[in-house]
């Protein structure tokens, strides 16, 4: 994943093995992966579809966090063009004890989640694009 590069669904079907950002020692973070283009950029009626949500990550140790939504790779419908898949990292003001992610995968609003948990603005982000493989 490198700032908008195009990847195939096959390349991203498995959970990433390396996710990194400039983390403060002892700080807790939230990581979310979302598709703002569901089911398509022209008609994003399911905006946003979240593909991954982890809270209470200690530093950059993603495996130390609490998984609220397991990773799902890109799976865009045929004929819907390129979708953006956005990774955002938020520094938490403290541990999050509410383990409800606030909705189903479609129509998830990362900003609403961030506001609910007082996360402020993202401290890191990246994205890739993918489209249906024929």
From Swiss-Prot:
Cysteine pairings via disulfide bonds: none
SUPFAM superfamilies noted in UniProt: PEBP-like
Record-linked PROSITE patterns: PBP
Pfam family, one: PBP
Family note: Belongs to the phosphatidylethanolamine-binding protein family.
Protein known as: Protein D3
Taxonomic classification: Eukaryota, Metazoa, Ecdysozoa, Nematoda, Chromadorea
């Amino acid at each position: 994943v490198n700032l908008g590069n195009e990847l195939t669904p096959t390349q991203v079907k498995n959970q990433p093995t390396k996710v990194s950002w400039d983390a403060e020692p002892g700080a807790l973070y939230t990581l979310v992966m979302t598709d703002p283009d569901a089911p398509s950029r022209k008609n994003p009626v399911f905006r946003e579809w979240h593909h991954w949500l982890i809270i209470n990550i200690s530093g950059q140790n993603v495996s130390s966090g609490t998984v609220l939504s397991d990773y799902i790779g890109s799976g865009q419908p045929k004929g819907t063009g390129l979708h953006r898949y956005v990774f955002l990292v938020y520094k938490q003001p403290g541990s999050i004890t509410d383990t409800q992610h606030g909705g189903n995968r479609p129509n998830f609003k990362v900003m609403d989640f961030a506001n609910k948990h007082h996360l402020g603005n993202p401290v890191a982000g990246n994205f890739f694009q993918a489209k249906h493989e024929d």
